[in-house]
Amino acid sequence: MRRGIIVLLSLSVVAAAAVFTADKWAIRHESIVFNDSTRGKRPVAVDFAVRRDKEMQADAGMLKLPVAILNHGNTVRFTEYSFLANVFAARGYLAISIQNDIPSDGPMVTKVGELYVGRLPQYQRAITNIKFAIEQMKEIKPSADYSKLTMVGHSNGGDIAMYFAKQYPDEIKNVVTLDNLRVPFVTDGRFKILSFRSHDPHFKPDPGVVPDEDECEKAGIIVVNTNFQHNDMRDTGPEEAKGSIQAMLDKFLADADSSAIAPVDTTNAAATILEPGPIPLRTLMEKVKREADIRRSGRAELSRTN
């Protein structure tokens, strides 16, 4: 039986944790804007992070990259969770951060008494964005495994991640939330869940969102109670908060993943970019050329619509 646990995150426990930085030789980030023609060419911006050595091996057909989808909080940009994306990338994931709202969407409002306090339309729109972005990323990164996703999100993004998991449980590998407040956890034990909770009096989860200790035990859910504020859980947060979350997340991935991929040392990766073994250079160059063509056509379409 998978065991759940409620943890009080201690800074002293993770003081020696590795720092996950986007060293230019180890992890790279790239931002792209896709336009959804079925929704009036709605722009859907994504930023993906990937380990360079694993990307090259995947492009050469040597492996498939697991995929993590990161969802931002309300009013926060999709690029403000690189501290999380880098942990996934260091573990060999293709980490895709998606911008789920645009200025023309208007502000998100709270409607007490309605399901998810009236935010269901935002969740549904986000799911459409995620599905669309995945289809576009398949063209750019076909060497990733999009059949089983790790859904990640902070605050409203955590609710989006949990709602997606409720709607598409067969497509989920893991769920990681940071202080989601509205959508109750999935408790049927079909996939692993890790949730970081803030110690913030201004951000309290709705009743029934976070399971009690017995339910966590039965469902294999890990709840990490921290002393951090709600808004500490993003790139602008204090280093001790981000470092602690990174360390616990990395441990969760190490325990949850069946692969032998270990995090790269992003401060000394230049000499060990590739693992031993031949790489078909022609195949790799064809992949690179095709990706460049796709990006150029996407940028040309974006310039025509602006």
Language model feature labels by segment:
Residues 4, 12-57, 263:
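An N-terminal hydrophobic leader/cap segment in hydrolases
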Residues 33-144:
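Serine-hydrolase catalytic machinery in alpha/beta-hydrolase-like enzymes
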Residues 64-67, 91-94, 146-148, 170-174, ...:
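Loop/turn elements at helix/coil->beta-strand transitions in domains of secreted/extracellular proteins
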Residues 134-189:
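Primarily recognizes the serine-hydrolase "nucleophile elbow" in alpha/beta-hydrolase
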Residues 185-190, 213-217:
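Short, conserved loop/helix-junction motifs that constitute active-site signature segments
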Residues 194-197:
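Short beta-strand/loop motif that positions the catalytic acidic residue
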Residues 202-209:
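Conserved alpha/beta-hydrolase "acid-adjacent" motif
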Residues 219-298:
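C-terminal catalytic histidine-bearing segment of alpha/beta-hydrolase fold enzymes
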